[in-house]
Swiss-Prot record:
InterPro entries: PLipase_C/P1_nuclease_dom_sf. It comes from the Bacteria. This is Hemolysin-1. GO terms for molecular function: hydrolase activity, acting on ester bonds; toxin activity. GO terms for biological process: killing of cells of another organism. Keywords: Cytolysis, Hemolysis, Toxin, Virulence. Bacterial hemolysins are exotoxins that attack blood cell membranes and cause cell rupture by mechanisms not clearly defined.
């Protein structure tokens, strides 16, 4: 079978591997990660609004596996902000924009914005869903899984340690990110652009990794402690000395897969009435309890002053690891010495005569697409990894940021959050080309003042077609986004990422917010702490009219005139 079938089944069962399942098109597979993420948040906030109290909730009788610390009494301001910024998305019913953003963020980890059913430029090319967002060795820690070369029981220790370290990194990055909104692709059975809170979107990365550390397809946990501790870590591409993640789409559809959070037999409980604790598998319910701790920790963290937040975030992340992602190194290094701990997916290391299969036998069930779109059946693990690496390189060469959005990138998948194909046919990289490592965030938040009277540019409403003036109701914060060639910039609204510092028709030339980056690229030309703004399309300068209190882009602008000079400051 394919590593991940791009078939009608995978269209319905959006991401069958590398995660608790995500919602599938048409509701064929219900929410998985999304349910854990939204419900844990709403339980912490006491804000559930779609489901009723479940009288058969197993947690009522539990003594372990429950959240340890959901105290948010020190985070009143952050909680108030979360509750005030509502979101009425009908699919997830998140109630809050922060919750919605985290849901989209955790989905991104699996999907990378890819349309799973149609993620190709053409069929004569690589499978970029696999090659970019699922299979690279260096992103396995985002799913709390082994790399292909994490062999033996020590490989489980190394992968668990890397997963813990990556979790801390994601938690801190989310807490310390610039406060702004960004546009991202939300992939799956279909794909669509959406805008999200940047901090909580990045928090979704930490949420995803954290929740994946509970999936029985990713790790071994035990009911003896109600799944609180990690015993071993599984693999996906026939790693020796490890149990393997299942490759069956059918197991997702009938709920027998460990990645499905719902009990077998509950598929007929459709609609919101089926989303209840008594329908959840025990380990998934523990994952939801742990996610409550995660949400509370992040709310507390976001309430801390930015100058002290990084240290606080690191401490909170470590506490979460100690409570929910810990393992006994000695136990893990000897876990598979007991053959009763090996299931029928276990791949033996060389010289092991006990229970399990050889890597060659495991590899016989795998296939993948190469860069030309041909299905190959590799005989060795290395051959498969080489095919995937080559396809990844080919895919990345064909991806670029949408104009005006090159500031926000995923440095792990190494693609922009708002990306596009460079062409409608595959472009071929030369033999020496390698994708450069993208920076996480190259945008700078700026404010602009007119030079003559030192008045800040403002706007009456952060909406399309509103003129940018002085003395209006709302301050205007802009993200300075690198443009083509690195010498010019787009100026995008910090608070509405679809809007750009642009102009009306050339006859009038009034500067305004506009819902397109087209012809809205500017050079920012310095001189003695003041600047000129030169539009690269018209080669004209932005100037200020004190009578109308507005800014304009016409031939009247001149770099030497005081009216064409601007004071630009960066926000901390």
């Amino acid at each position: 079978m394919n590593i991940k079938k791009l078939s009608l089944c995978i269209f319905f069962a959006t991401t069958q591997v590398h995660a608790f399942t995500q919602w599938g098109a048409g509701g064929i597979t219900p929410m998985g990660h999304e349910w854990l993420t939204r419900t844990s948040a709403l339980e912490v906030l006491n804000a559930e609004h779609k489901t009723s109290v479940d009288p058969n909730d197993p947690r009522n009788t539990w003594t372990s596996g429950l959240a340890k610390n959901i105290d948010i009494s020190t985070a009143d301001d952050e909680v108030a902000k979360i509750k005030s910024h509502t979101n009425d998305n009908s699919l997830y019913a998140p109630r809050s924009d922060a919750v919605y953003s985290a849901i989209v963020g955790q989905r991104w980890v699996d999907l990378g914005g890819m349309n799973v059913a149609n993620n190709l430029i053409s069929q004569t090319g690589p499978d970029c869903f696999d090659a970019v967002s699922q299979e690279p060795a260096d992103i396995q820690q985002d799913h709390f899984m082994r790399r292909y070369d994490d062999n033996g029981q020590q490989g489980g220790v190394k992968s668990a340690q890397r997963g813990q370290e990556r979790f801390i990194t994601h938690f801190i990055n989310a807490a310390m990110a610039t406060n702004k909104r960004i546009v991202v692709w939300d992939g799956g059975g279909s794909s669509a652009k959406t805008d999200v809170d940047y901090n909580y979107f990045l928090f979704g990365r930490a949420v995803h990794l954290f929740q994946d550390s509970f999936s029985p397809e990713h790790v071994v946990r035990s009911p003896s402690d109600n799944y609180e501790k990690v015993r071993q870590v599984k693999a996906y591409i026939c790693t020796e000395g490890a149990e393997q993640h299942a490759h069956s789409t059918g197991a997702v559809l009938d709920y027998t897969s460990g990645d499905v959070i719902w009990k077998v037999g509950t598929k007929t409980d459709t609609g919101w009435g089926g989303y209840k604790a008594s329908n959840m598998k025990p380990v998934a319910l523990v994952a939801m309890e742990a996610s409550k701790d995660l949400w509370a920790a992040f709310m507390r963290t976001m309430s801390v002053d930015i100058n002290e937040r990084e240290k606080y975030a690191r401490n909170e992340a470590q506490v979460l690891i100690d409570k929910w992602m810990s393992f006994d190194k000695d136990e893990m290094e000897h876990w598979y010495d007991n053959e009763n701990n090996r299931d029928n997916t276990y791949v033996k290391v060389d010289g092991d005569t006990g229970k399990g299969k050889l890597q060659k036998e495991c590899m016989s069930g795998l296939s993948a697409k190469n860069r030309y779109g041909a299905t190959i059946k590799p005989k060795t693990q290395k051959e498969l990894v080489d095919v995937l690496d080559d396809s990844r390189r080919y895919c990345l060469f064909n991806i670029e940021a949408e104009p005006g959005y090159a500031d926000a990138n995923d440095p792990y998948l190494n693609i922009p959050f708002n990306w596009r194909w460079k062409s409608n046919s595959w472009l071929v990289p030369n033999a020496s080309w390698q994708q450069k490592q993208l920076d996480r965030d190259t945008g700078k938040i700026i404010k602009i003042k007119e030079f003559t009277n030192n008045q800040e540019l403002t706007v009456d409403s952060i909406e399309n077609n509103y003129s940018i003036v002085t003395g209006a109701k709302k301050p205007l914060s802009l993200v300075r986004v690198p443009g083509d060639g690195g010498k010019s910039f787009y100026l995008r609204s910090k608070d509405n990422p679809y809007l750009f510092f642009s102009y009306s028709d050339k006859k009038n030339g009034r500067i305004k917010l506009w819902h397109s980056p087209n012809q809205a690229e500017f050079e920012i030309l310095p001189g003695n702490n003041i600047f000129n703004l030169k539009n690269t399309y018209w080669n004209q300068y932005v100037w200020y009219d004190k009578n109308s209190k507005g800014a304009y882009l016409t031939e009247k602008g001149s770099p030497d005139n005081a009216s064409s000079k601007w004071i630009i400051s960066e926000e901390n």
